[in-house]
Regions:
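Acidic/charged, solvent-exposed loop-and-adjacent secondary-structure segments enriched in E/D, K/R, S/T
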Residues: 17
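Catalytic nucleophile loop
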Residues: 1-14
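Amide-donor transfer/coupling interface in amidating biosynthetic enzymes
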Residues: 20-120
Length: 120
């Protein structure tokens, strides 16, 4: 998830430094007790590459972060949102960033890794 945040900044975006202090939300974005289970759902944006890969409108994701996208970087398209409106994934051309940890989510995230490998 740190890479997601760094990518956003590299594209000229900004971050909330501490979600609990800077945003009102009922979503726990830092569920350290259960890092390998879904903490909340995200809504995928139809027409994005991520939506095409996953094929679902809503998926459950783990959530281990205290920072998040404030202003989205230039040229990035938001491809998933948490129920509180926080951007949880973005993309552009050959770049895909997700705020969750797909490596800890099991087989349901295999398509993300397949897309990455095929893009090499």
């Amino acid at each position: 998830c740190r890479g997601f945040q760094l990518l956003n900044v590299a594209f000229g975006g900004t971050l909330y430094q501490d979600l609990e202090k800077e945003r009102d939300s009922s979503i726990n974005h830092r569920n350290l007790d259960k890092p390998y289970t879904a903490s909340h759902d995200v809504e995928l944006t139809e027409g994005t590459r991520l939506y095409s890969m996953i094929g679902e409108k809503y998926i459950g994701v783990n959530s281990l972060h205290h920072q998040g996208v404030n202003a989205l970087g230039f040229g990035l398209t938001a491809s998933a949102y948490a129920p509180d409106g926080l951007v949880e994934a973005f993309e552009c051309e050959k770049t895909l960033g997700v705020q969750w940890h797909p490596e800890a989510m099991g087989d349901c995230m295999d398509t993300i890794f397949k897309d990455f490998i095929e893009g090499l």
